[in-house]
UniProtKB/Swiss-Prot annotation:
Keywords (A to Z) from UniProt: Membrane, NAD, NADP, Plastoquinone, Quinone, Thylakoid, Translocase, Transport
Similarity annotation: Belongs to the complex I NdhO subunit family.
HAMAP family tied to this protein: NDH1_NDH1O
Reactions accelerated catalytically: a plastoquinone + NADH + (n+1) H(+)(in) = a plastoquinol + NAD(+) + n H(+)(out); a plastoquinone + NADPH + (n+1) H(+)(in) = a plastoquinol + NADP(+) + n H(+)(out)
GO CC, alphabetical: plasma membrane-derived thylakoid membrane
Assembly and oligomerization: NDH-1 can be composed of about 15 different subunits; different subcomplexes with different compositions have been identified which probably have different functions.
Protein's name according to its UniProt entry: NAD(P)H-quinone oxidoreductase subunit O
Protein role: NDH-1 shuttles electrons from an unknown electron donor, via FMN and iron-sulfur (Fe-S) centers, to quinones in the respiratory and/or the photosynthetic chain. The immediate electron acceptor for the enzyme in this species is believed to be plastoquinone. Couples the redox reaction to proton translocation, and thus conserves the redox energy in a proton gradient. Cyanobacterial NDH-1 also plays a role in inorganic carbon-concentration.
UniProt source species: Picosynechococcus sp. (strain ATCC 27264 / PCC 7002 / PR-6) (Agmenellum quadruplicatum)
Domain of life: Bacteria
Enzyme class name: translocase
EC number annotated for this UniProt entry: 7.1.1.-
Cellular location(s): Cellular thylakoid membrane
GO MF annotation, one: quinone binding
């Protein structure tokens, strides 16, 4: 799946992949609804991570590529 993702791709977070991951444990457990329910845009890529911007007034976040799916 990672081969399909590139800068500018629209993505959605895969809840099953994100839950109980290191990234989830490092975050507040009360994730906002937009995190799983909306799409984001990949702004940058780094090996196995993507910098994702959601279309809400919140900071962009780094997520593992295996936690994302193309929309």
């Amino acid at each position: 799946m990672a081969a399909k993702l590139k800068k500018g791709s629209l993505v959605r977070v895969i809840k099953e992949q994100f839950t109980n991951s290191l990234e989830a444990k490092a975050s507040d457990s009360r994730l906002p609804a937009y995190f799983f329910g909306s799409q984001g845009e990949i702004l940058d890529l780094d090996d196995e991570y993507a910098f994702v911007r959601f279309y809400t007034p919140t900071p962009s976040v780094w997520l593992r590529l295996d936690q994302l799916e193309a929309v």
